[in-house]
Amino acid sequence: MGLTSQLIPTLVCLLALTSTFVHGHNFNITIKEIIKMLNILTARNDSCMELTVKDVFTAPKNTSDKEIFCRAATVLRQIYTHNCSNRYLRGLYRNLSSMANKTCSMNEIKKSTLKDFLERLKVIMQKKYYRH
């Protein structure tokens, strides 16, 4: 009985550490996938890259990453209505949504091209990857 009561706290601590490691590992994999998709998308020169989208990256400095990812995912979801739905945009949307708030405000007035939007998102994700 004495040995079991000593093992329980140790096992709980190990379980907590393992789940933190797995979450961090999955997070890095998601960021790597996003960067890979962004590299592929920004190398393309099709008409979809010239679409005008909201510039969600002009948000105030104190905006959280989850809020920025939510806004970026919202922009990507809106692109689907322009017949630009390809597997990389869908995958990018799915991965960003998994890292984002469920809802967010979209008050941006400034606009940019989809290509510029994706380039800026790539820089943000690369910084996040190297920080993490």
Curated annotation (Swiss-Prot):
- Is Disulfide bond among the key words of this record? yes
Keyword terms of this UniProt record = B-cell activation, Cytokine, Disulfide bond, Glycoprotein, Growth factor, Secreted, Signal
**Keyword Endoplasmic reticulum attributed:** no
What family classification does the UniProt entry report for this protein?
Belongs to the IL-4/IL-13 family.
Q: Name one GO cellular component term.
A: extracellular space
Residue positions the entry lists as glycosylated: N28, N45, N62, N83, N95, N101
Provide the gene name from the record: IL4
Location of the protein in the cell: Secreted
Stated role? Participates in at least several B-cell activation processes as well as of other cell types. It is a costimulator of DNA-synthesis. It induces the expression of class II MHC molecules on resting B-cells. It enhances both secretion and cell surface expression of IgE and IgG1. It also regulates the expression of the low affinity Fc receptor for IgE (CD23) on both lymphocytes and monocytes. Positively regulates IL31RA expression in macrophages. Stimulates autophagy in dendritic cells by interfering with mTORC1 signaling and through the induction of RUFY4.
| GO BP | B cell activation; immune response; interleukin-4-mediated signaling pathway; negative regulation of apoptotic process; negative regulation of inflammatory response; negative regulation of osteoclast differentiation; positive regulation of B cell proliferation; positive regulation of DNA-templated transcription
Output the Gene Ontology terms for molecular function: cytokine activity; growth factor activity; interleukin-4 receptor binding
Q: Which cysteines are joined by disulfide bonds?
A: C48-C84, C70-C104
Q: Which PANTHER family match?
A: INTERLEUKIN-4
| Name of the protein described by the UniProt record | Interleukin-4
Predominant cellular place of this UniProt entry's protein: secreted
Q: Taxonomically, what lineage is the organism?
A: Eukaryota, Metazoa, Chordata, Craniata, Vertebrata
Signal peptide residues are 1-24
